[in-house]
Amino acid sequence: MSETPRIQLLSPRLANQIAAGEVVERPASVAKELLENSLDAGSRRIDVEVEQGGIKLLRVRDDGRGIPADDLPLALARHATSKIRELEDLERVMSLGFRGEALASISSVARLTMTSRTADAGEAWQVETEGRDMQPRVQPAAHPVGTSVEVRDLFFNTPARRKFLRAEKTEFDHLQEVIKRLALARFDVAFHLRHNGKTIFALHEARDELARARRVGAVCGQAFLEQALPIEVERNGLHLWGWVGLPTFSRSQPDLQYFYVNGRMVRDKLVAHAVRQAYRDVLYNGRHPTFVLFFEVDPAVVDVNVHPTKHEVRFRDSRMVHDFLYGTLHRALGEVRPDDQLAPPGATSLTEPRPTGAAAGEFGPQGEMRLAESVLESPAARVGWSGGSSASGGSSGYSAYTRPEAPPSLAEAGGAYKAYFAPLPAGEAPAALPESAQDIPPLGYALAQLKGIYILAENAHGLVLVDMHAAHERITYERLKVAMASEGLRGQPLLVPESIAVSEREADCAEEHSSWFQRLGFELQRLGPESLAIRQIPALLKQAEATQLVRDVIADLLEYGTSDRIQAHLNELLGTMACHGAVRANRRLTLPEMNALLRDMEITERSGQCNHGRPTWTQLGLDELDKLFLRGR
């Protein structure tokens, strides 16, 4: 029988190397910790120099406050920090770092040299370590005010960790992504990156709104900026601002999603769920939304100390945060209209509430053009850049693109269109399109129908192509949703109630949310500590698997405090009804019918995509048409 192992203290060197496994995974992890220290030091410019993807060399130089000579050795000790003093400080921490273990972990697995000088010091001082096998040596050095940290030969003393590193290009891509994330978090700081002697990018300080937009374009691509909707909303102490990509600018991977909480980038499942819900009706299956969003909240109501790499946070009132994020993004996306997507470059949309669904002009089956008798006011609030300052300072630099107060009625639009094409009196010159773009509807006037599928229209920008079935499907779908919301859900009692075996926690959750289930057409009754009975279901969902649906909804309520599964099932059914009720391919439409459909699209929420996330229309500008025919060359 083998001897029982005895408990003993680990050596400081081994303890640091084990701790490094949590903090230092690859060169990108080192860059993150060093850059966060530079930002916490009040830097206004940070230079990063990399060799071999950061494996051979990673040097970060800043112009921050610097570190006093006496504190340099202490900076490399574990759990030594200048950012917090007591537990209460942790509850309101705003610095990116606060644990005091990053430099100790890095210096235990690499050759580290740190040089620093404060503003009141006559000279700089330098400290060197080499894998914790040597005591830190402090000596005078030449350096301007600020700090430089040089990390060489990462994992030189831990071969097992080094062999898990990927190719140089892969490691550099990860490192570059870290710098981009921080560059978006701090518009007021300049970032410069060099790799193997070559300048990769130089991002200058961005103080005003236009400069911030340029940085977003430099980091995320100009295409994102051109297809993004700027938003800013503040309510009940919660402030959300940034850019959300239009549904037509989706990605196959979630690689263009940046979300910051008080300046700290996080990947939180609560946030991901809220964003996914907001885009639910407009994204094609398997596609991912794009966004750069900044969420600001009182530090006392968010816990950032829940993950070793601080990528996750915990909100005190997660339900309120979830509903605020979902509601803001859902309204912003719902208020996008064709004229937002056709607005002049540099303009942002300040959208007003407008009628939707049944309130929109109806596209009649026989070419009738009429307005609904009752107008349902949209509850959406104004979404757009306000004139106030944002988190990074400065005021809005965007000019407002203002829509007409109300779209013309369909009868007026049809009359104007008929007059435009009416035979001219003898000797009268041909009519020209209005000189002002504001006199032409965003989707223009119909010219013809192609193959019984597409509508060709002319607007101020050029040619518009519309998938008439997809467009009418979205219009019908939105009307059905409005009708369901106004009339409520009718419940259907079950002749034989269905019983469900659940855990006691799940039963408590169902009982707590019984009124919520009731509003959605369900009636649940608790039979015992671990059993429920379904006595009523929504009439529209009589074909659904009620037992599994209730289980899934309860799981969501326990996880997120809310659930959209019932609504998703209802929307799926309404989508099917809309698809069958929409105008079919190969149906010949008259010009008034086509124009009625275009006007409906202009005042219907989410009309840019059908119920399945496919685009309903596209624009071919005159420049694009000229290129096709080699004009102007």
From Swiss-Prot:
Record-linked PROSITE patterns: DNA_MISMATCH_REPAIR_1
GO biological process: mismatch repair
Signal peptide boundaries: none
GO molecular function: ATP binding; ATP hydrolysis activity; ATP-dependent DNA damage sensor activity; mismatched DNA binding
Domain of life: Bacteria
SUPFAM superfamilies assigned: ATPase domain of HSP90 chaperone/DNA topoisomerase II/histidine kinase, DNA mismatch repair protein MutL, Ribosomal protein S5 domain 2-like
One annotated Gene Ontology cellular component of this protein: mismatch repair complex
Region (Disordered): 337-364, 383-405
Annotated coiled-coil segments of the chain: none
Key words, A-Z: DNA damage, DNA repair
Family: Belongs to the DNA mismatch repair MutL/HexB family.
Summary of the function given for this chain in its UniProt record: This protein is involved in the repair of mismatches in DNA. It is required for dam-dependent methyl-directed DNA mismatch repair. May act as a 'molecular matchmaker', a protein that promotes the formation of a stable complex between two or more DNA-binding proteins in an ATP-dependent manner without itself being part of a final effector complex.
PANTHER family: DNA MISMATCH REPAIR PROTEIN MLH, PMS, MUTL (PTHR10073), DNA MISMATCH REPAIR PROTEIN MLH1 (PTHR10073:SF12)
Name the record gives this protein: DNA mismatch repair protein MutL
Source organism of this protein record: Pseudomonas aeruginosa (strain UCBPP-PA14)
Taxonomy of the source species: Bacteria, Pseudomonadati, Pseudomonadota, Gammaproteobacteria, Pseudomonadales
Gene that encodes the chain: mutL
